[in-house]
Structure formats: structure tokens, C-alpha cells
UniProtKB/Swiss-Prot annotation:
Identification of the protein by name: Ribonuclease P protein component
Gene name linked to the record: rnpA
Subunit structure: Consists of a catalytic RNA component (M1 or rnpB) and a protein subunit.
Keyword Nuclease: yes
Reaction catalyzed: Endonucleolytic cleavage of RNA, removing 5'-extranucleotides from tRNA precursor
Coiled-coil region list: none
Superkingdom field: Bacteria
One CC-aspect GO term: ribonuclease P complex
Annotated organism of origin: Ectopseudomonas mendocina (strain ymp)
Length: 134
């Protein structure tokens, strides 16, 4: 089980980490006013990066509120997102959503992103089986 905290190891910190996700995303989840891009990170925990510019959300107070809401939603849903680097890109209109609407929208987006990932169990070769009588 993944710890529920949101420490430094759960964040994308450097431009190189963001660039890796932008250059070759292996998963996408577009929403009405947001885009989630994801890429495998080969770690046992997910990492989150936020891109919320002034063009998308004018007021700093609103940008900070949105970032808090997204981080909290990520923290609560990270068990389903293990092994991914995720970048959230804001679009116009994101600042108009209330906290409840944000939480609901991101709950759906995390689930959509988790479903879009190929199963990790699919790495087992088809000729192998745990059944000795097969």
C-alpha cells in the first residue's frame, strides 16, 4: 500500500521530469477544463506535477485553491495511480469550478487514467502457468 502523504518524493520537481511526461505520455485523460498526461515512472509510487498558468486562471488565490484541491484529490486516489508520473495542465474555465465540482471531476479523471493503463499482470508470458497440471 502506498503511503497517503504528499511528500517531496510524490512530486515532479525538475523541468526534465516535466519534459519527459510532455514528450512521451503513455496515458491521457482530457476533461472539460483540464488535461491529464501520464507516463510510466518505474517507481512504486505516483508523482504529480501541476501546470496552472495565469492565462488559464487569472487570480493567484484561485490558482492556489485549485492546486490545493488537485493535490488533495491526488493524495486520496494515489493507490490507483502507482507507477505513473502525472502532469495536470489547466485550461480556461478551471477557476470557475467550485471545490465540490473540482473534486468530482478529478475523481472521474483519476479513474479514467487508471483504466487507460495496460495491466501490469499482462507482462507474464502466455506459455507460463501456476497450474502444474496444465
Amino acid at each position: 500500500m502506498v503511503s497517503r502523504g504528499f511528500g517531496r518524493e510524490k512530486r515532479l520537481l525538475t523541468p526534465r521530469q516535466f519534459k519527459a511526461v510532455f514528450d512521451s505520455p503513455s496515458g491521457k485523460a482530457p476533461g472539460k477544463s483540464v488535461l491529464l498526461l501520464a507516463r510510466d515512472n518505474q517507481l512504486d509510487h505516483p508523482r504529480l506535477g501541476l501546470v496552472i498558468g495565469k492565462k488559464s486562471v487569472k487570480l493567484a488565490v484561485e490558482r492556489n485553491r485549485i492546486k490545493r484541491q488537485i493535490r488533495e484529490s491526488f493524495r486520496l486516489n494515489q493507490d490507483n495511480l502507482v507507477g505513473w508520473d502525472i502532469v495536470v495542465v489547466a485550461r480556461k474555465g478551471l477557476g470557475d469550478l467550485e471545490n465540490g465540482e473540482l473534486a468530482q471531476q478529478f475523481g472521474k479523471l483519476w479513474k479514467r487514467l487508471a483504466r487507460s493503463r495496460p495491466s501490469r499482470d499482462a507482462d507474464v508470458s502466455p506459455g507460463t502457468s501456476d497450474n502444474p497440471h496444465a
